[in-house]
């Protein structure tokens, strides 16, 4: 009996654990501290800084099953998903890694043992082929002489992409940096499937499938293209779980493995589909995986960046559900079946199931309202299309009006062998793209891309002043030896009391001072293991190696500490009041305010806000000690410490406890006791996205300032009402009641005036072939009274056509009324449109009543004068 996908995942991890590898959990799909990546798309992403030498771990061997998404950006598989055997938006990458430990010999031997060992995957050896880089004789000889693969099944692949080292078998992190040859392992499905071995003209067939890529990082590529050997060569491998599952379960398509069969059956059940071979079932089964895990990792549907990619995937799935005949929202119902098939890999998703389902349901409901109309418009455009290309303007209109991502439109068109003018679409989208996705893209400023080889020691938990030494200087992202007065720069010290922005807490400000120089620090950021002080040299000169005195702005840091501690108290209070589904989705801890985004599906009630406030202030009054302990990550979690899912933690973590009320992992700076916070007040609660709420709050002096401001406002109102704050409610209710009474009396007077005006106007009507025509501009009449007057005049005049106008603050208001017996000849909507066009406006309505507005009051007399001729022509 073949292994299940879950068993294959576990077997891989167990194998490498038995070989001395640390089993590391999958990192978030949102890359941590890497502005160059849209989504985590490979197992090595979370170890990038380790390979670059910017991060150190307490292990030199690791193994993971990493969740990955490839959709959007460079890796965009979206249009192929569901239509090929192996394209996915979401997949799991099995990997083993060596950080300066073992190299080619062990990496190859491990792979061979796992794939062919009787106690492991037990694949037939004769079915396995390998490729090596053309000049990698070492790997070739290991495969041939040690493993025993015949030469005819070992293929050398050279520079097949048009440049030196541009090869399927040479891996590079970028234009510079770690790189090296790789060896790939292929599985031969047999001659009953078309295709040739790698490197042959038929290599794109499905007979020979790559199942494992083993990268040997042995060089450091310089800017001039030269390759320098790395002092500690490393190994990075990747094997797609879905691919190896297909091989081990003896199927040719990833969509036929047990995991996808179960999901496809679930999709068929919720959509009512009966043909399990329908490609739309595959599309939806794939898309629920990426969408559910993206939402669980904090991505929400939006019109920019990651959120836009998520929206595109959701809407593509919904449209395929529509094709299958789904009559109601269905997509969110697949989260449960997904959790079941993921097993232990779906535990975090299970904890957030309700939140994920709500986000997906809300997005589907929003799109469903326009999907049918949008598809109808697209069908109409395609039906009258001359040629085989849909114009970009129509594609843009579908996006702008109906929320159709262009790739969804392209999907529909592809099914009819029609192309989309994407260049025209991009031209029409230029303004929106600049305002949304491009404007807020991932370029980051130059500071984010600085690479610092040195490390800084943070001593700011215990010190706000410290002597240190300059180890690096950067100007415009480039390393320099010295800076002069007036220059902006990033200064790196060997040790510093300045806290670098992290975990939502803003970076410190202050000064670096020394012999004849002063550097004003405006921000502090992390660069790998270094801490950079961003600012401007206000006096003197500063060079690498100089001694400095680092002084943190003490008052500002103190306010930040209070706000950070209050954030922890509020997080715990929210979970008590609203439920344990509350999870942090983002935060800002500054010296002025604390902002906290959290998962919750509805606006908080005033009573809930008050309860959270009261709970936090109760803990402040308890004056609990705020204690920190350093311990192993597993021990901290066992103690109940809350960890932020997707946050990157070291093996040793800092646990912050506030009595028995709150325990969290946190590297930030905090008060000594909860009583230091003084007072906590929530100043706003709002929604930021589906299923996400935001609270802003203040503490200490800031909280007292809000109390004083509120008291001052109450006193001002009491003074205006000639009362005091004690009976203010009664006073306001009395004023409101009196106001309502006066407004009622005023309306009665206006109605009487309008009725009188209508009576006066009726005598001005002229007869046109038995129809009374009345056209008049009225002064001093509110626009909303015109409708009442038209109704009165229609009752008085019988067969009639009426046009009334008034001008208020330069804006023209128009109304046309036509008695029902005349609407077969004169339509009020057409009439009002003719008049409105002349005064710079537009309008519309029913055949018997229509309204309009305009901006050109000077043109009104001429416009009204044209009515009689227009109506006369219609009545003839």
Swiss-Prot record:
GO terms for cellular component: cytosol. Its EC number is 6.1.1.7. It comes from the Bacteria. It is found in: Cytoplasm. Its cofactor is Zn(2+). Disulfide bonds: none annotated. Signal peptide: none annotated. InterPro entries: aa-tRNA-synth_II/BPL/LPL, Ala-tRNA-lgiase_IIc, Ala-tRNA-ligase_IIc_anticod-bd, Ala-tRNA-synth_IIc_core, Ala-tRNA-synth_IIc_N, Ala-tRNA_ligase, Ala_tRNA_ligase_euk/bac, DHHA1_dom. Binds 1 zinc ion per subunit. Pfam families: DHHA1 (PF02272), tRNA-synt_2c (PF01411), tRNA_SAD (PF07973). It catalyses: tRNA(Ala) + L-alanine + ATP = L-alanyl-tRNA(Ala) + AMP + diphosphate. It is an enzyme of class 6 (ligase). GO terms for biological process: alanyl-tRNA aminoacylation; negative regulation of DNA-templated transcription. The keyword Chaperone does not apply. GO terms for molecular function: alanine-tRNA ligase activity; aminoacyl-tRNA deacylase activity; ATP binding; tRNA binding; zinc ion binding. Homotetramer. Belongs to the class-II aminoacyl-tRNA synthetase family. Consists of three domains; the N-terminal catalytic domain, the editing domain and the C-terminal C-Ala domain. The editing domain removes incorrectly charged amino acids, while the C-Ala domain, along with tRNA(Ala), serves as a bridge to cooperatively bring together the editing and aminoacylation centers thus stimulating deacylation of misacylated tRNAs. PANTHER family: ALANINE--TRNA LIGASE, CYTOPLASMIC (PTHR11777:SF9), ALANYL-TRNA SYNTHETASE (PTHR11777). Catalyzes the attachment of alanine to tRNA(Ala) in a two-step reaction: alanine is first activated by ATP to form Ala-AMP and then transferred to the acceptor end of tRNA(Ala). Also edits incorrectly charged Ser-tRNA(Ala) and Gly-tRNA(Ala) via its editing domain. This is Alanine--tRNA ligase.
């Amino acid at each position: 009996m073949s292994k299940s996908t879950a068993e294959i995942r576990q077997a891989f991890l167990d194998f490498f654990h038995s070989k001395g590898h640390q089993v590391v959990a999958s990192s978030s799909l949102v890359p941590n501290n890497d502005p160059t990546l849209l989504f985590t798309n490979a197992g090595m992403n979370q170890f990038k800084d380790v390979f670059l030498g910017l991060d150190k771990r307490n292990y030199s061997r690791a193994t993971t099953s990493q969740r990955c998404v490839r959709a959007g950006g460079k890796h965009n598989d979206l249009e192929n998903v569901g239509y090929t055997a192996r394209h996915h938006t979401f997949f799991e990458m099995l990997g083993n890694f060596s950080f300066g430990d073992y190299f080619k010999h062990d990496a190859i031997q491990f792979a061979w043992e796992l794939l062919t060992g009787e106690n492991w995957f037990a694949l037939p050896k004769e079915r396995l082929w390998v490729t090596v880089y053309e000049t990698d004789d070492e790997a070739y000889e290991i495969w041939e002489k040690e493993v025993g693969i015949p030469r005819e099944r070992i293929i050398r692949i050279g520079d097949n992409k048009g440049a030196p080292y541009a090869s399927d078998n040479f891996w590079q992190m970028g234009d510079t940096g770690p790189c090296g040859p790789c060896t790939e392992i292929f599985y031969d499905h047999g001659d009953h499937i078309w295709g040739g071995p790698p490197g042959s003209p038929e290599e794109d067939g499905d007979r020979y499938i790559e199942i494992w890529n083993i990268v040997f990082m042995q060089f450091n590529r310089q800017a001039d293209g030269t390759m320098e050997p790395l002092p500690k060569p490393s190994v990075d491998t990747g094997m797609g779980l879905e691919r190896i599952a297909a091989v081990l379960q003896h199927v040719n398509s990833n969509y036929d493995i047990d995991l996808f069969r179960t999901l496809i059956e679930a999709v068929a059940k919720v959509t009512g589909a009966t043909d399990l071979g329908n490609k739309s079932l595959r599309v939806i089964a794939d898309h629920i995986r990426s969408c559910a895990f993206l939402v669980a990792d904090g991505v929400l549907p939006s019109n920019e960046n990651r959120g836009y990619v998520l929206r595109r995937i959701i809407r593509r799935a919904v449209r395929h559900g529509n094709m299958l005949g789904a009559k109601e929202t269905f997509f969110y119902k697949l989260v449960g079946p997904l959790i079941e098939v993921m097993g232990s890999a779906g535990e975090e998703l299970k904890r957030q199931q309700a939140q994920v389902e709500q986000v997906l349901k809300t997005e589907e409901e929003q799109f469903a309202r326009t999907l049918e109309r949008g598809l109808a418009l697209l069908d109409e455009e395609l039906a009258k299309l001359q040629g085989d290309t849909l114009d970009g303007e129509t594609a843009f209109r579908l996006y702008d009006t109906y929320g159709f991502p262009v790739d969804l439109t392209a999907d529909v068109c592809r099914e009819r062998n029609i192309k989309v003018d994407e260049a025209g679409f991009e031209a029409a989208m230029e303004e929106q793209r600049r305002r949304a996705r491009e404007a807020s893209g991932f370029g980051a400023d130059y500071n984010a891309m600085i690479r610092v080889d040195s490390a800084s020691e943070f001593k700011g938990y215990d010190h706000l002043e410290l002597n240190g030494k300059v180890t690096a200087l950067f100007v415009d992202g480039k390393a320099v030896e010295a800076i002069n007065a007036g220059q902006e720069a990033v200064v790196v010290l060997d040790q510093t009391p300045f806290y670098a922005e992290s975990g939502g807490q803003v970076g410190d400000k202050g000064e670096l001072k020394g012999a004849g120089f002063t550097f004003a620090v405006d921000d502090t950021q992390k660069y790998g293991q270094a801490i950079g002080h961003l600012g401007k040299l206000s006096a003197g000169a500063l060079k690498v190696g100089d001694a400095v005195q680092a002084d943190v702005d003490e008052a500002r840091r103190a306010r930040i500490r209070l706000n950070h501690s209050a954030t922890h108290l509020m997080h715990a209070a929210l979970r008590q009041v609203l439920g344990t589904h509350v999870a942090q989705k983002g935060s800002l801890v500054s010296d002025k305010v604390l902002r906290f985004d959290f998962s919750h599906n509805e606006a908080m009630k005033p009573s809930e806000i008050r309860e959270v406030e009261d709970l936090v202030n109760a803990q402040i009054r308890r004056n609990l000690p705020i204690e920190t302990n350093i311990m192993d990550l597993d021990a901290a979690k066992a103690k109940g410490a809350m960890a932020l899912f997707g946050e990157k933690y070291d093996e040793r973590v800092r646990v912050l406890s506030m009595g028995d009320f709150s325990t969290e992992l946190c590297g930030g700076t905090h008060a000594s006791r909860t009583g230091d916070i003084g007072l906590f007040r929530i100043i706003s609660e709002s929604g930021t996205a589906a299923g996400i709420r935001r609270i802003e709050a203040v503490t200490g002096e800031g909280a007292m300032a809000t109390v004083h401001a509120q008291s001052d406002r109450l006193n001002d109102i009491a003074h205006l009402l000639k009362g005091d704050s004690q009976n203010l409610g009664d006073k306001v209710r009395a004023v409101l009641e009196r106001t309502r009474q006066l407004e009622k009396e005023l309306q009665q007077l206006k109605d009487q005036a309008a009725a009188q005006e209508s009576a006066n106007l009726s005598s001005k009507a002229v007869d046109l072939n038995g129809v009374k025509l009345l056209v008049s501009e009225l002064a001093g009449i509110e626009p909303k009274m015109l409708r009442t007057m038209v109704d009165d005049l229609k009752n008085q005049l019988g067969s009639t056509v009426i046009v009334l106008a008034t001008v208020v603050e330069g804006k023209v208001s128009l109304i046309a009324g036509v008695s029902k017996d005349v609407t077969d000849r004169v339509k009020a909507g057409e009439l009002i449109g003719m008049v409105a066009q002349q005064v710079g406006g537009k309008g519309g309505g029913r055949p018997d009543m229509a309204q309009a507005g305009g901006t050109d009051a000077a043109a009104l007399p001429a416009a009204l004068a044209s009515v009689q001729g227009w109506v006369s022509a219609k009545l003839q």
